[in-house]
């Protein structure tokens, strides 16, 4: 199976760690993508299409390819509408630290569920289909926890290291919220919370001023 992976070094490392030697893969950064790579691929995993919209046009060169696109900060329906794709297509959770897990977290359009099982069988991966919404499931919940942890520090209730330790010991989480934020990347956390706020209009996604301050300091 010829798999093309588009993303940065972290995405490549997570993909390789998850699938190991099960599948031969073409590992290209998003800046090296070209028509020949796309034409030769059976399956394309694009971790960065939302930040590189020009990719969407290139994929028309191979309408037979199965497109797997990182849709955490948007929806699959919105992407298909924008790019007019006719491929077999699925959205996946491609946030750093969330791809290399036992389950692929996927979204699909109406009528697309029938092919998901077949594709994941070829990939030799377990999967779960979630609703096609901004934030999917795991990213939405985790980023809300991170945001609330920043509010806790801002209010002076506890220090970061104490919150991380309490969450690990008290809830059996593998990492505390601040460690998770570093793994995911604060920019991703900020951008997802912002997208959730725009999508839902709900106050619970309001970004903590301390989180925003840290995010802006990194830019």
Regions found by a protein language model. Name each.
Residues 1-132, 160-219:
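NAD(P)-dependent Rossmann-like dehydrogenase/reductase catalytic/cofactor-binding core
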């Amino acid at each position: 199976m010829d798999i093309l992976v588009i993303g940065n070094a972290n995405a490549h490392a997570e993909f390789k760690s998850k699938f190991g030697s099960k599948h031969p893969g073409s590992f290209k950064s998003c800046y090296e993508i070209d028509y020949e790579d796309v034409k030769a691929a059976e399956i394309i995993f694009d971790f960065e299409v939302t930040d590189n919209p020009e990719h969407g046009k290139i994929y028309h060169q191979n309408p037979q390819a199965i497109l797997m696109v990182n849709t955490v900060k948007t929806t699959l329906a919105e992407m298909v509408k924008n790019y007019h794709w006719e491929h077999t297509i699925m959205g996946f959770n491609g946030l750093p630290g969330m791809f290399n897990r036992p389950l692929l977290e996927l979204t699909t359009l109406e009528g697309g569920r029938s092919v998901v099982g077949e594709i994941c069988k070829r990939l030799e991966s377990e999967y779960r289909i979630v609703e096609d919404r901004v934030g999917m499931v795991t990213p939405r919940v985790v980023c809300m926890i991170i945001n609330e942890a920043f509010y806790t520090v801002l209010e002076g209730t506890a220090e970061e290291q104490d919150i991380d330790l309490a969450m690990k010991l008290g809830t059996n989480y593998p990492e505390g919220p601040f460690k998770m934020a570093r793994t995911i990347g604060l920019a991703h956390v900020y951008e997802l919370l912002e997208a959730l706020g725009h999508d839902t209009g709900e106050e619970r996604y309001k970004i903590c001023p301390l989180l925003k301050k840290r995010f802006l300091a990194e830019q």
